[in-house]
Amino acid sequence: MTPVESLWIVLVVLFGIVGIVRGFLKELGVTLVLIVLLFGLTRLDANLKKLLDMATSKIQAVGQLYGNPTVWLIFYAVIIIGVMYVAYQGYVLKYPGDEPKGVQGTLLGLMVGLINGYLFIGALWYYIEKYKQPLQALGIIQGEYSALAQKLVKILPPDLLNPFLPFLVVFMIILLVVK
């Protein structure tokens, strides 16, 4: 079976290639959407569970879903994939300015694409790691992670960027507004 870190690296590199094709300024719009998504999910995580706890205390059937890791994994995966789909297929937030030409434009597109891949695939991996019990039961995740994968899990976006997300959101919005 392919190590999870190999799949992660391949997918992040694929996003880098997409970044080259789409261009630096369009990819920055996706970066803004991803940072706002991560900000929302990290703030929503604790509050959503408290809210559901209050709401489901009287409804037994929903209360059984509340503690189910499969439901939480599907919930977060659908939100992350749905937001990414809209970010790439829906209204495109394109930062103002002209696309840099030549090697500079290619490298900027690659860099921002790699960042977007890290944010997207890293966020998915974070929630898969957090709620991995259903995937282990299905045999999708088997055994322990390699040493590299264990190091990568510690630097996934929700954990690594959590203290900086409010500042990153403001910074990215300022970049969008200032021409």
Where are these regions (language model features)?
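Alpha-helical transmembrane segments and their juxtamembrane interface "caps"
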Residues: 1-179
